Amino acid sequence: MKCSHKLGHSLTPHSCFWWLFLLCTGLSWSFADGNGNNSTYQYIYNLTICELNGTNWLSGHFEWAVETFVLYPVVTHILSLGFLTTSHFFDALGLGAVSTAGFVGGRYVLSSVYGACAFAAFVCFVIRAAKNCMACRYARTRFTNFIVDDRGGVHRWKSPIVVEKLGKAEIGGNLVTIKHVVLEGVKAQPLTRTSAEQWEA
């Protein structure tokens, strides 16, 4: 699916897992109703949560389970507007629960379909989580100006001017021997020497 930048938050792939399946189910159900095709009815039955009605896991709670099945994708879609990674996680969790229930109840067709959807949602969650970690790492390491001392220590430094005392740079109240000065990610060279040093990338 190719979406514009403005629609990217509303047309998220994770919600399509639910909505596309529900849409196809509804259209197939209408088609079967118009043609009286019992085999199509059975096929649809095997691919919806109705298949779990006869299992021990759901037989006593089918009514609220159906309501949850309908409302769950709505909630996750709304959640995706502000918390996309979290909504992917809940998609994988919900689809995985239905798949597990189908497997335990011996409904292997239902289990395989929802298991594939759960896996796709989980992959989306992993991708989003990895991107979030990369963004967090960049946010914490975006400083490009720093000083490397002779012991390999890295000290953040914003100014191109370094004040020396006794041949050492004063950083945070401590005196360190400068090995390299990096400005905007580039190794700098001393420009002028006075009572202080000015470095230029």
UniProtKB/Swiss-Prot annotation:
Please state where this protein is localized.
Virion membrane
* Assigned keywords, A-Z: Clathrin-mediated endocytosis of virus by host, Disulfide bond, Glycoprotein, Host-virus interaction, Membrane, Signal, Transmembrane, Transmembrane helix, Viral attachment to host cell, Viral envelope protein, Viral penetration into host cytoplasm, Virion, Virus endocytosis by host, Virus entry into host cell
Span of the secretion signal?
Answer: 1-32
Quote the PTM field.
Answer: N-glycosylated.
Query: Does the UniProt entry include the keyword Acyltransferase?
Result: no
**Topology class, membrane:** Multi-pass membrane protein
Side Virion surface, residues:
33-63
Q: Record's superkingdom? A: Viruses
What's this chain's function? Major envelope protein present in abundant amounts in the virion envelope. Mediates virion sialic acid-dependent attachment the sialoadhesin receptor SIGLEC1. This attachment induces virion internalization into alveolar macrophages predominantly through clathrin-dependent endocytosis.
UniProt-listed InterPro entries: Arteri_GP5
Major localization listed first in the record, in broad terms = virion
> What is the protein name stated in its UniProt record?
Glycoprotein 5
Decide whether keyword Ribonucleoprotein is in the record.
no
Point out the glycosylated residues in this chain: N37, N38, N46, N53
Single Gene Ontology BP term?
Answer: clathrin-dependent endocytosis of virus by host cell
What GO cellular-component annotations does this UniProt entry give? membrane; viral envelope; virion membrane
Q: How does it assemble?
A: Heterodimer with the membrane protein; disulfide-linked. This heterodimerization is required for transport to the Golgi complex. Interacts with host SIGLEC1; this interaction plays a role in virus entry into host cell. Interacts with glycoprotein 4.
Can you tell me where the transmembrane regions are?
64-84, 109-129
Can you name the source organism? Answer: Porcine reproductive and respiratory syndrome virus (isolate Pig/United States/SD 01-08/2001) (PRRSV)
Report the sequence similarity comment from the record: Belongs to the arteriviridae GP5 protein family.
